[in-house]
């Protein structure tokens, strides 16, 4: 089968490698190169780099216009596989592919349709999530489900952890979905009454409010890693938080909210919140290295009693 692959995110790299090993990938659609670093030199993303290493045609249009459509048609693809491309496809584009178009979405659809399912499932404190391969339609993430699996989310898992899991565990579902398509299986219609949605996460929400519960704060910290990274201030320095857990307890109720009350080598850096204790596991002073809580504490032994703001 001649497959056209669309992605702009490293989460899809393993799928691109495996699908290219087993099928004829005739083209890759990805985002334009972006300026990066102090010199603002153009940076090639992982998807483009892998495609070029395999001598696969790479398209990086700003707009999916008529010229792009004609170029894709000239590649004579049969199916399009999409995994975190970042743009909406019009029907004219979807109609190029006679076998159809399928999309990998990292949630248990119809739950968490939209651009940030991995972060949102952590923000909401869910204990399970999943991977869905669906047929593509004009309505976002609403196509028939061809394959789906679920996995457990641990309390201290970050978005980085889930991205890695999804990256390594999506390919088998793609094969299951392809086999169903070729057999004429239309999949399972999503129940729109159970659909929920997620939106883009921005920098404006990354500041930690320690008046919230420890559970909600640790969810925010873990969800916002690797971006936009939750943060607070300590001694007029910005501190970035990368990983956390929590303890549900009424102890320390007499302590000031945001106060670093203790360091426990077996748990982490303990911070008083509006409800419970935040256990900080990884953090960073701006401009310094990311450290585990033990290393951070040993380099800042005067932490106990200080207050985050």
UniProtKB/Swiss-Prot annotation:
Question: What Gene Ontology cellular component terms go with this record?
Answer: cytosol
Q: Which reaction does it catalyse?
A: L-methionyl-tRNA(fMet) + (6R)-10-formyltetrahydrofolate = N-formyl-L-methionyl-tRNA(fMet) + (6S)-5,6,7,8-tetrahydrofolate + H(+)
Q: Does the keyword Protein biosynthesis apply?
A: yes
Q: Where does (6S)-5,6,7,8-tetrahydrofolate bind?
A: 107-110
What Enzyme Commission number(s) does the record list for this chain? 2.1.2.9
Q: Which Pfam families match?
A: Formyl_trans_C, Formyl_trans_N
MF terms in GO: methionyl-tRNA formyltransferase activity
Identify the keywords attached in UniProt to this record, alphabetized.
Protein biosynthesis, Transferase
Keyword Transferase in annotation? yes
Family listed:
Belongs to the Fmt family.
What the protein does?
A: Attaches a formyl group to the free amino group of methionyl-tRNA(fMet). The formyl group appears to play a dual role in the initiator identity of N-formylmethionyl-tRNA by promoting its recognition by IF2 and preventing the misappropriation of this tRNA by the elongation apparatus.
The protein's name is Methionyl-tRNA formyltransferase
Q: What is the lineage of its organism?
A: Bacteria, Pseudomonadati, Spirochaetota, Spirochaetia, Spirochaetales
